[in-house]
């Protein structure tokens, strides 16, 4: 291919175009990163700073416990640049379906855009798939127009159990799955691949407990569409800086 010669003005314009293109790519990646703020010690000042960072950086979401939803909705303001997610029955999923449904409705009333609900792990381990399916349907009905994501705690599941719960979720119309809460360790890349192989394009996969930009890129390459991290602002800033 013949090399194209550019004068100084054209070269400047070309470099500016590349910079903008790189920045757009970085911003799109940052929009896939969600800020996890579900530690028991997360206080008001940390939540306020987190919401400011999430708005400024245009992160994908701020993920909090139900008791922080109203406060974060206030901190994010009337024109938020990020979404607000409530993590229900975190991290063990041991609440009854009735309690989970009530918590989902309350979180939506308080201002969340999406809810993440942890699966009833014990029911999965016991093979009570009827309970799992009924719960998924009840949660789907409770969310109405709001988005629903199911945390499947894949580290606790055997391969056959993982396949089964993913299939049930997809059949119930659930369009987003979270690999794990992080309470039992982060999801390995082969688990992301395994989930992707089951759900195909029916569900978006959220890979959690990602701590570095390299890990973000690896998880996305494995099929994840969303990233959860306690280090979301730092990762986002590094991503944007690399695009300059």
For each predicted feature, which ranges?
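Glycine-rich phosphate-binding active-site loops on the catalytic face of alpha/beta enzymes
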Residues: 86-90, 110-124, 171-186, 208-244
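Hydrophobic faces of well-ordered beta-strands that scaffold small-molecule active sites
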Residues: 29-37, 61-64, 82-90, 115-117, ...
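Active-site-adjacent beta->alpha loops and helix N-cap segments on the catalytic face
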Residues: 64-83, 94-99, 122-142, 156-162, ...
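Conserved, mostly hydrophobic/aromatic
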Residues: 34, 72, 107, 150, ...
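Conserved N-terminal beta1-alpha1 strand-loop-helix module at the mouth
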Residues: 2-109, 168
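Alpha/beta catalytic cores of nucleotide-metabolism and tRNA/nucleoside-modifying enzymes
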Residues: 1-48, 193-205, 212-244
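Catalytic cores of alpha/beta
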Residues: 95-106, 157-168, 197, 201, ...
């Amino acid at each position: 291919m013949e090399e194209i010669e550019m004068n100084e003005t054209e070269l400047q314009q070309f470099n500016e175009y590349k910079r903008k293109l790189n920045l757009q790519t970085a911003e799109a990646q940052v929009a896939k990163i969600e800020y996890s703020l579900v530690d028991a010690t997360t206080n008001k000042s940390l939540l306020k700073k987190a919401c400011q960072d999430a708005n400024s950086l245009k992160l994908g979401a701020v993920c909090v416990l139900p008791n922080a939803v109203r406060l974060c909705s206030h901190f994010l303001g009337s024109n938020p640049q990020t979404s607000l997610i409530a993590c229900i029955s975190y991290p063990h999923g041991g609440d009854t379906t009735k309690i989970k449904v009530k918590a989902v409705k309350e979180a939506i009333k308080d201002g969340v855009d999406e809810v993440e609900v942890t699966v009833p792990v014990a029911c999965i381990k016991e093979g009570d798939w009827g309970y799992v399916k009924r719960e998924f349907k009840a949660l789907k009905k409770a969310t109405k127009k709001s988005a629903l994501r199911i945390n499947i705690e894949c580290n606790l599941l055997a391969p056959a159990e993982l396949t089964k719960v993913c299939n049930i979720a997809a059949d119930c119309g659930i369009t987003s799955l979270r690999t794990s809460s992080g309470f039992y360790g982060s999801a390995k890349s082969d688990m992301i691949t395994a989930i992707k192989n089951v759900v195909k394009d029916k569900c978006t996969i959220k890979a959690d407990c990602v701590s570095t930009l390299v890990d973000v890129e690896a998880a996305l390459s494995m099929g994840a569409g969303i990233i959860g991290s306690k280090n979301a602002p730092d990762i986002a800033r590094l991503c944007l800086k690399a695009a300059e």
